[in-house]
UniProtKB/Swiss-Prot annotation:
Protein name as catalogued: AA11 family lytic polysaccharide monooxygenase B
Disulfide bond positions: 50-165, 87-113, 206-240
Glycosylation sites: 120, 134
Gene3D superfamilies: 2.70.50.70
Region (Disordered): 226-345
Binding site for Cu(+): 22, 82
Leader peptide range in chain numbering: 1-21
Species whose genome carries this gene: Aspergillus fumigatus (strain ATCC MYA-4609 / CBS 101355 / FGSC A1100 / Af293)
EC number: 1.14.99.-
Amino acid sequence: MMFSKSGLVAVAMLGASAVEAHMKMRQPTPYSDSSLNNSPLAADGSDFPCKLRDNAFVPPSQETIAQIGEVMPLTFTGSATHGGGSCQVSLTTDLKPSKDSKWMVIKSIEGGCPANVDGNMSGGADVPDPFEFNYTIPAGIEPGKYTLAWTWFNRIGNREMYMNCAPITVTAGSSKRDAAPVAEKVEVEKRSANFPAMFVANINGCTTKEGVDIRFPDPGDVVEYDGNPSNLQPAGEAACSGTPAWTVSGGSGSPSTPSTSSSTPAGTSAGVSVSVGATVGATPTAEPESSSSEPAESEGAPGVFAPTSATVFPSTPTASAAPTSSSSGAGSESDSSSSSNGALTGPCSTEGLWNCIDGSSFQRCANGQWTTAQQMAAGTECTVGQNAQFTISATAVKPRMINAMRHRKRAHGGHRHA
């Protein structure tokens, strides 16, 4: 759901619900989930990392298993989304992390995380966040046991840092990818073996600016833009002000000794995608209100989910969801060049503009450049042309296809009982 309200109303919404519900990671399942509350880290950093407390690292009954290159779900519970913000996904080899732990960022989401809304959503602390995200364990990470951290810097409200942690077991990639030519594997690993350190602020003397989706000083290779471009912090502006009393280490790449040894060499999946620059990611799977319609399951482009009817995602919240004419944005990107399949490359001038290519793939103008085209999810199509609003419609999916997708999902659900 996109909220189109004035800033005053957004702040009022924030104040009304922030007391009763913040946000909490749902997938992957966190450590000590029963004792994990949805509040931010302490302002003095005393519970960093992972909201330290008694018995903070009790593993869940279901262990999260992630194959290198596999797209994994990143989902949340709660409604106090504080106008969204920016998030990172990081890994450490420490199974009981401390302030001395080394964190490796594998994905940064700048804007729209954990939801692309003006203020807060309704529903309370136990309502699933309809905006779903994902992450992929990249090449350069060795198989073994890790702690995954989700960190969030909210756009509206008190200057806070949220952090939830979950145990995760990384397994080697598919044999098909492992059999790729040596030169190809070396190039992928070269691009993805250097992971920056986790960004820390609002608990260490360096404070983020309110009202903007921060840009991380070192976001890494995989960066996703899910918010409204007008909210994104200007390029070159510092992510926080003040001198940090402390930071965390990280960034050198795959550790030589993961938390548990494995005789299987590291591999990469056929689905691995090292994205240098902007990508377009999460979209809501449904309206925040409950619906009796079940979205079609998909294995398409990461973060794009199949709605059961036409759905519109505006670049900037508007009171109306009516799509603009497909010609409204056409011709405005005169400096761009077009490939044989209709995808645009090079600079673009209308920040946030969507380009639907043949209904089966799409791209977006982000940071003045056209992103790489991504395939639509199975069972969906977009309205062809350049638009300020992105319209997704469900296509007919045969029952046999749906059953096959459900079978694959059950077979690769990403969990096993510990």
